[in-house]
Amino acid sequence: MRVRRSILTILGFALLASACSGSDDPASPTAAPTGPSGSSLSMEVASSDLAVGAAQHFEVGIFSSDGQGVELLSFGQLSMGFSYLGDGSGTARPGPQAVGTYVGAYGTSQGGSEPTFTDPNDARGIYLADVMFDQAGTWQVDATVDIPDEGSRTLSASFVVTKEHSLPAPGDRAKPTENLTMDSTGVPPAAIDSRALDGAPVPDPDLHGTTIADALDQQRPILVLFSTPTYCVSLMCGPETDGLEALANQYPDRAVFIHVEIWRNYQKSVVNRAANDWVCCDATGSLTEPWLFLIGPDGVIKDRWGPLFDPDEVAKELAQLPR
């Protein structure tokens, strides 16, 4: 089993997706005109498990790199145009258009109305749009963004859309998984939350109080996040886990909030069974995370986000579900 890693890990900042592994990665970033101070400007598709059918969250990240390091494009909006390439042998067919809105990692700066290059320590995130794909095969996204003092830039990246999702998706029934909880015995605390290393306590025990199976039996809405805050190759998993904790504190009576750690034993590459049930594997045979799933009281998945989610948008969707 592979863990899909973003191209940004090559640059030292896997900021967009903990997913992809070498030459069989379906997403292909393409360098574009230069960025600030002549740096190389690139875009990457952060989403995975894209399939034909209903509109789904599509996420891209844009970064500039030079000998001094990496900066990320943050804030504001950009326009996206999609083209269907099929197997790549024919003429590209124009597809949907969309506007991508910036979503920052939880706890980082969300400010700024215009796209701006930022230090990843200050702001990091993606641009999200809801897009529907009508055919399986290779697609291309062309993103155009107006950057103050830099002008208009257009970047392209290709990605694969499959006939069906490989992972649980909206409309599917949630799997009645017996994930580890604070009451689990015979397991190290780090298997419950990877931050509980070297005697450290589980930092968010309230997110580990029940199993997905028990929560489904309660017939209540569920928000379950699959992430590994310590071993994630991106800088997104920890903030997203904190974001779920914040939602749990703000809406304690609206849903059951669950965090599932990816690794049972990271050093031996042993994945927790619950994580294996839900996020392994995509069409490339890779485990992908982080993923947040919203499950209705009827046990059906209503929405999912990966790798990033907007807590305000999640809260709005949660509020629409019956208690």
Where are these regions (language model features)?
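Typically the conserved alpha-helix immediately C-terminal to a functionally engaged Cys/Sec
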Residues: 234-251
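C-terminal motif of bacterial Sec signal peptides marking the signal peptidase cleavage site
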Residues: 16-19
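Short active-site neighborhood of thiol/selenol oxidoreductases, capturing the structured segment around
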Residues: 193-196, 203, 212-233
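Contiguous segments within soluble domain cores/interaction surfaces
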Residues: 26-197
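Bacterial signal peptide processing site
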Residues: 21-24
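Bacterial N-terminal signal peptides that target proteins for export
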Residues: 1-10
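Thioredoxin-like thiol-disulfide oxidoreductase module
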Residues: 259-289, 294-298, 320
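Thiol-/selenol-based redox modules, centered on thioredoxin-like
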Residues: 167-168, 188, 294, 301-323
